[in-house]
Amino acid sequence: MKRLTIITLALLSLNIMTAAKTNKTVTLRIIETSDVHGAFFPYDFIERRPMNGTMARVSTYLKRQRQKFGNRLILLDNGDILQGQPTCYYSNYVKTDLPNVAAEVINYLKYDAEVFGNHDIETGHIVYDKWIRELNCPTLGANIIDTKSGKPYVEPYLMLERNGVRIAVLGMLTPAIPNWLHQNLWSGMRFEEMVSCARKWVKTLREQEKADIVIGLFHSGWDGGISTLHYNEDATKKVAEEVEGFDVIFFGHDHTEHNSTLSNGVLCLDPSCNAIKVAQATIQCSFINGHWAITRKQGEIIDITKETVDEDYVKHFQPQIDSIRQFVEQPIGTFLTSMSSRDAFFGSAAFVDYIHDLQLEHTGADVSFNAPLQFDTEVRKGTVYMSDMFKLYRYENQIYTLRMTGREIRQHLEMSYNLWVNTMRTPDDHIMLLTDQSWDDKQRMGFKNLTFNFDSAAGIDYEVDVTKPDGQKVRILRFSDGRPFEEDQWYRVAMNSYRGNGGGELLVRGAGIPMDSLPSRIIYMSPRDQRHYLTEKIRHEGNVAPQSHHNWRFVPTEWAEPAILRDRKLIFKE
């Protein structure tokens, strides 16, 4: 009788629990940041002024969301967090005895998962392996394969359970890393194509892990970018359309805000960059017929700029903020003239030519390629500080020297100017290749293409005829020292490591050098980053008067000069 009573009570309890679960509805909120690029604190350490957005305001927003959702809030970061501000550089390479500030921020805000971005890989094993160890949450990368074990280098996915709902987060990175970065930065790794990788792991998540919700967290843009026979740089759209089983995909890398739901029901979100906005998915689940089903799903892009700064957050990180301020406020030298990145789009300009000087002096090359890495900044006459080094040179690239023929040099420049300038058919046409589409990545602002691929050359004199069709605009006249320039001769060409490894595809699609041949063309790689040598150069010179080389120009001048004035006013509101 006692045993029967116990069984009856157990069955009654099970029925009550089942009935309760049957009627249960759970609402989850998932928030993503992406491409934060060191925007941790409400101060721009490059421009030395207050900064919009930043994780200090994200923190305020998260506090409110945690009060409302508690453990039903899931917080994800989508990579490219280790480069972008002096904050990162200081933590990555200067003050290395302390935890990486990027790890400290992620830990303080209690993120559930992180993924790799290409700029995180660019910091090198010493930096990112330390960062991974210091994180309290897992770093995900299902398609980043350890070449020794054949298994993912980091965790492929994360399983979470919230109020009985099983949630899987699958992380992936764009496989185009070899197109930008030298293998010494990702030694022991290879990068799988995203569609096949996603298909394999979603099957595992649904069948073995019994996930009720599957979330993608991809450091890969929506569509486009580099496309090869083996992979696509920006493959999020392709994965969302072709791989069955995703409910939500958070993505980034392309610095372009996105919120859409595909015909197959997959919600796709991208918050753009610099912690200006966050991507947010709200998912309502109900327990129906013995399993959890999504009954409502909504995506939003939330503007963070109107949030107040979280003073508790700032107070917690005040020692780091003070140290970074001290670092960027170091005087380096004196500029006798001002120079602006704006000038670099309209002809030979000191802002770019000073980097050309550095590359030619450092390598002894015949020719130098360089593009403006900041879209709209100025280094003013007077004392130059460490912060200005990040204006002059934004990224931690090395200096490379490659062997190229004269023909390859011209073809490289042809592609650069194809991306850069319009083909003018009348004197009233635009000279710049512009678009009506609005970009918020601070790197285009009216231009159709990314301006960090607008390479000019030093060491040679040349003209760019804006009335000629693409591929026929560049006419190289001579070397700047008077030597003849020959298309069939081999020359030494200095450039940054991003370009030398294939970044922007100017060497591959432009110059026509096969991607797998690029390593054999490299004859020099600097041991330190370019900004280090730039800082040394200015310290050595003391008083610096940067000058334009005046070695190239747009022609015909009677069309080009008025068009430059019009487009400059249009782009920069001058």
Model region roles, listed by residue range:
Residues M1-K24:
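Bacterial Sec-dependent N-terminal signal peptides
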Residues R3-T5, S13, L75, G245, ...:
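Intrinsically disordered, low-complexity peptide-like regions
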Residues I6-L9, G70, K210, G364:
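Residue-level recognition of short, structured coil/turn motifs
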Residues L11, A20-K21, D212, M495, ...:
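Intrinsic disorder/low-complexity segments
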Residues L12-S13, F45, Y90, M415:
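Alpha-helical transmembrane segments and their juxtamembrane interfaces
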Residues M17-A20, G79, R553, K569:
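Intrinsic disorder/low-complexity detector
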Residues K21-K306, F346-L358, S368, S526:
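Acidic, metal/ion-coordinating pockets
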Residues K24-R29, T33, A39-R48, G53-R64, ...:
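Catalytic centers of hydrolytic enzymes
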